[in-house]
From Swiss-Prot:
Pfam families linked: K_trans, K_trans_C
Topology of this chain in the membrane: Multi-pass membrane protein
Protein name as it appears in the record: Low affinity potassium transport system protein Kup
Gene source species: Salmonella typhi
GO molecular function terms listed in the Swiss-Prot or TrEMBL record: potassium ion transmembrane transporter activity; symporter activity
Length: 622
């Protein structure tokens, strides 16, 4: 989104507040409570409060302000961000072996996101609804049912799109951040001593005083920066400057004031540790604050759900996930999409998590491993981009990487302590997604290599057909072709069984480029191979929708006229069997067969009218 128009900058910045900062903006609901709840062997003590506040403040400065907003966001692919984009950028100017390692890192990072995204809606909404414990303690048993009801409504409206409702997100989140600031400032004024925690010396003293326990406590501190990846992932929607402007002018000051306000409250009233966020508010404001918190957490959950849809589309288009139905919910905004399978699978997982963990404090134990793991991978990938793509001095890049890892690795290591108490959940989900993505990519590559290794040369085949033509029938036939130099299987089988050929044959290749968008000038390349054969290569970015009708329109503009309803589309449908393999590769082969059976069929994927498609089967051993 362009920010060149100065009049639109405030609107874009406001929109960024509504979408990008939902997750990190709702962290004050539970972060300080988890830090000082007594689980680490110490309670609400002055040194502990100052230590945690200092750690939270400097994490927000170093990780969010310096690492992500200043450094990582420099790495963009035509304005787009995200872990898979970073993976693609990092592998552009490296050796094949290094690229493979970087791809694995990127896929692990993407898998971590899938693992963590199940927890975010659950912990956010539950922590807001838990404000009922303060307003009406007798309603404690309603927290789980109400959380499920709220999230059920949220997942149900996804198919209708969030365009209209989304217009309310920005003002609601702006109100949320202003309330955070006011509540915090009110408490700080009553006890300004808490501002001493801005001094990083208190963070150092915290480690010296509490020793090993302080290291484990980092697992709770990291809750303050969950959602930081959204800043980079949503860069393509809003642009770098509005996201940075929103952070430094609204979000960061509001978060700092609220965290320090909670700290000031706890110094005077240690018993407020039950729920320091809601106890910041006067009694008359509790119910309005509860409603606002519920709205803010729903918006944070919406941002995460939209992020899952975007990541899934990117993974599908880059060939790491099987094709699935992707529905555009807005004619104006290409980023607003709905993926039914992902939506309801995520909903089911979130409900199971809520019922299983019952309280946001229990969920906090599962939160953080995937976030910090992604942070480590982001540090490695982004510094690789700085060295290989930007050609920065290798010693300077090494210093940056060391500085990042000196923060990331301790945070990740501290979260490993959560493994048995809930951290296994996002790791298990991430492992499942990593297995699915690597299986689809590698087995798909094996299949295509198997199909093409004995394929006939395109040029030789066309020359033979022109010299000794079979029976020609009127009309145009389009054969979907994956490889430019090999005759499509469907063409070979049509000649073998029907022994006829249309008077005009088009070999169509649809290609996804490593970029979010492809300019219309480069959309279609046409090459006449013989008097009756044409090759058409259509290129799309991974954020664009493959559309054969649009390709035909572009072909018509360049002199190759085609009418969709007068053209026959020939496609090959592979029936796969798993050959002799070691047991673990047989399992992977079985998983690939399952994924392919449930994948979206090519006619639906490319938006081709079903009555114009002829599928010819072939059996392939993998």
């Amino acid at each position: 989104m362009s920010t060149d128009n100065k009049q639109s900058l405030p609107a874009i910045t406001l929109a960024a507040i509504g979408v990008v900062y939902g997750d990190i903006g709702t962290s004050p609901l539970y972060t300080l409570r988890e830090c000082l709840s007594g689980q680490f062997g110490f309670g609400v003590e002055r040194d502990a409060v100052f230590g945690f506040l200092s750690l939270i403040f400097w994490l927000l400065i170093f990780v969010v302000s310096i690492k992500y907003l200043t450094f990582v966001m420099r790495a963009d692919n035509a304005g787009e961000g995200g872990i898979l984009t970073l993976m693609s950028l990092a592998g552009r100017n490296t050796s094949a072996r290094t690229t493979s390692m970087l791809v694995i890192m990127g896929l692990i990072g993407g898998s971590f996101f899938y693992g963590e995204v199940v927890i975010t809606p659950a912990i956010s909404v539950m922590s807001a609804i838990e404000g009922l414990e303060i307003v009406a303690p007798q309603l404690d048993t309603w927290i789980v049912p109400l959380s499920i009801i709220v999230l059920t409504l949220l997942f149900m409206i996804q198919k209708h799109g969030t365009g209209m409702v989304g217009k309310l997100f920005a003002p609601i989140m702006l109100t949320w951040f202003l309330i955070l600031a006011v509540l915090g400032l009110r408490s700080i004024i009553a006890n300004p001593e808490v501002l001493h925690a801005l001094n990083p010396v208190w963070a150092v003293r915290f480690f010296l005083e509490y020793k090993t326990v302080s290291f484990i406590a980092l697992g709770a501190v990291v809750l303050s920066i969950t959602g930081v990846e959204a800043l980079y992932a949503d860069m393509g929607h809003f642009g770098k400057f509005p996201i940075r402007l929103a952070w430094f002018t609204v979000v960061l000051p509001s978060l700092v004031l609220n965290y320090f306000g909670q700290g000031a409250l706890l110094l005077k009233h240690p018993e407020a540790i039950k729920n320091p966020f809601f106890l910041l508010a006067p009694d008359w404001a509790l119910i309005p604050l509860l409603i606002l918190a519920a709205l803010a957490t729903v918006i944070a959950s919406q941002a995460v759900i939209s992020g899952v849809f975007s990541l899934t589309r990117q993974a599908v288009r880059l060939g790491y996930l099987s094709p699935m139905r992707i529905i555009h919910t807005s004619e104006m905004e290409s980023g607003q999409i709905y993926i039914p399978f992902v939506n309801w699978l995520l909903y089911f997982a979130v409900v199971v998590v809520i019922v299983s963990f019952e309280h946001s404090s229990n969920l906090a134990a599962a939160y953080g491993i995937a976030v910090t793991g992604t942070m480590v991978l982001t540090s490695i990938l982004s510094t690789t981009v700085a060295r290989k793509n930007w050609h920065w001095n290798k010693y300077f890049v090494a210093l940056i990487l060391i500085a990042f890892l000196c923060v990331d690795i301790p945070l990740f290591s501290a979260n490993l302590d959560k493994l048995l108490s809930g951290g296994w959940l996002p790791l298990s989900l991430g492992l499942i997604m990593f297995t699915i993505m690597t299986t689809w990519k590698s087995e798909r590559f094996r299949l295509l290599r198997r199909m093409h290794e004995h394929g006939n040369s395109l040029e030789a085949m066309i020359a033979s057909l022109e010299k000794s033509p079979p029976v020609r029938v009127p009309g145009t036939a389009v054969y979907m072709s994956r490889a430019l130099s090999v005759i499509p299987f469907a063409l070979l089988h049509n000649l073998k069984h029907n022994k006829v050929l249309h008077e005009r044959v088009i070999l169509l290749t649809l290609r996804t480029e490593d970029a979010p968008y492809v300019h219309n000038v480069r959309r279609v390349q046409i090459e006449q191979l013989s008097p009756t054969f044409w090759r058409v290569v259509a290129s799309y970015g991974w954020r664009e929708t493959l559309n054969v009708e649009e390709v035909f329109h572009r072909c018509g503009l360049e002199g190759l006229s085609c009418r969709m309803m007068e053209t026959s589309f020939f496609m090959s449908h592979e029936s796969l069997i798993v050959g002799k393999r070691p047991w673990y590769l047989r399992l992977r082969g079985k998983l690939y067969l399952l994924l392919q059976r449930n994948a979206l069929r090519a006619p639906d994927q490319f938006e081709i009218p079903p009555n114009r498609v002829i599928e010819l089967g072939t059996q392939v051993e993998i």
